[in-house]
UniProtKB/Swiss-Prot annotation:
Catalyses which reaction(s): pyridoxal + ATP = pyridoxal 5'-phosphate + ADP + H(+)
Essential cofactor(s): Mg(2+)
Annotated positions binding substrate: S12, T47, Q48, D225
Molecular function GO terms recorded: ATP binding; magnesium ion binding; pyridoxal kinase activity
InterPro entries, per database record: PM/HMP-P_kinase-1 (IPR013749), PyrdxlKinase (IPR004625), Pyridoxal_kinase_PdxY (IPR023685), Ribokinase-like (IPR029056)
Bilayer-spanning residue ranges: none
Protein encoded by which gene: pdxY
Family: Belongs to the pyridoxine kinase family. PdxY subfamily.
Protein name: Pyridoxal kinase PdxY
GO biological process: pyridoxal 5'-phosphate salvage
Species the sequence originates in: Pseudomonas putida (strain GB-1)
């Protein structure tokens, strides 16, 4: 029997709706990955509602929980770590300590960093100390880095002016340590307004993918969290970078189609679960000569 991979997901959680782990855990489980959720914050709902209740996990709890897993002899079974929204830079450093602890017992474990800072259309949503931590410390420790356009621009200290510019900027991040960069949401000047674009960049190659841009009265939250989670899960299940990239685009599109059909502000993960596992659509990534 083929072994089921295990993934430690360290990011935010909302009681109502879908963001952070609440957007990523169930889809990753649905496609065949055991997920260990470690919630950096627990809020009543995501912050785009404008009001919420809840609290941030004390940073010291993160290594303590990782050590607790070690104490029962299970830490070596962890095949990957996913990190997302951070409540503080101190929390981020605690996550890196946890990643180091896991890699000490399983050197093959992957670390995907989703450097959540904000949204190209909404601006930065995290404190300056968190942005600085992501830019100066986290990127160098990640095997996979998954920024959106705002975050890519922040890493490189300038705004991208073209698709080629985005490729060059993503490739510059590889020099800091990651094996691969996935730009989850491209927003460069001159792009097609009716398309949602993504980018996959390794040291040798780059791939560009487009899917239809679906219209919503209010853009659902958690799409980036869903994207990062599914990409890592598919890699853990044996996909190549490109296969995982194409699958993720298709599965996320299926969720958005269902969400749009329901006229919902929250992602319709449960209703779309079969199409997450078996997308009906396929978007082919184009190999760029860049």
């Amino acid at each position: 029997m083929k072994r089921t991979p295990h993934l430690l997901a360290i990011q935010s959680h909302v009681v109502f709706g879908h963001a952070g782990n609440s957007a990523a855990v169930f889809p990753m489980q649905r496609i065949g990955v055991n997920v260990w959720p470690l919630n950096t914050v627990q809020f009543s709902n995501h912050t785009q509602y404008g009001q919420w209740a809840g609290e941030v996990l004390a940073p010291a709890q993160i290594p303590a929980l990782v050590e607790g897993i070690s104490n029962i002899g299970e830490l070596g079974h962890c095949d990957a770590v996913l990190s997302g929204y951070l409540g503080s830079a101190e929390q981020g450093r605690a996550i890196l300590a946890g990643v180091e602890r896991i890699k000490a017992v399983n050197p093959k474990a992957l670390y995907l960093c989703d450097p959540v800072m904000g949204h190209p259309e909404k601006g930065c949503i995290v404190p300056p100390e968190v942005s600085a931590f992501l830019l100066e410390e986290a990127a160098a420790r990640a095997d996979i880095l998954c920024p959106n356009q705002l975050e890519l621009d922040s890493f490189c200290g300038r705004r991208a002016q073209s698709l080629e510019d985005c490729v060059n900027m993503a490739r510059s991040l590889l020099k800091r340590g990651p094996q691969v960069v996935v730009v989850k949401h491209l927003a460069y000047p001159g792009r097609a307004e009716d398309q949602f674009e993504m980018l996959l960049v390794t040291a040798e190659h780059s791939w560009h993918l487009r899917r239809p841009l679906l219209a919503f009265p209010r853009q659902p939250v958690g799409v980036g969290d869903l994207t990062s989670g599914l990409f890592l899960a598919r890699v853990m299940l044996g996909d190549s970078w490109v296969q995982a990239f194409e699958f993720t685009a298709a599965a996320v599109h299926e969720v958005l189609l269902e969400t749009q059909a329901c006229a919902s502000y929250e992602l319709q993960l449960v209703r779309a679960q079969d199409r997450i596992a078996h997308p009906r659509v396929r978007f082919e990534a184009q190999l760029l000569a860049l």
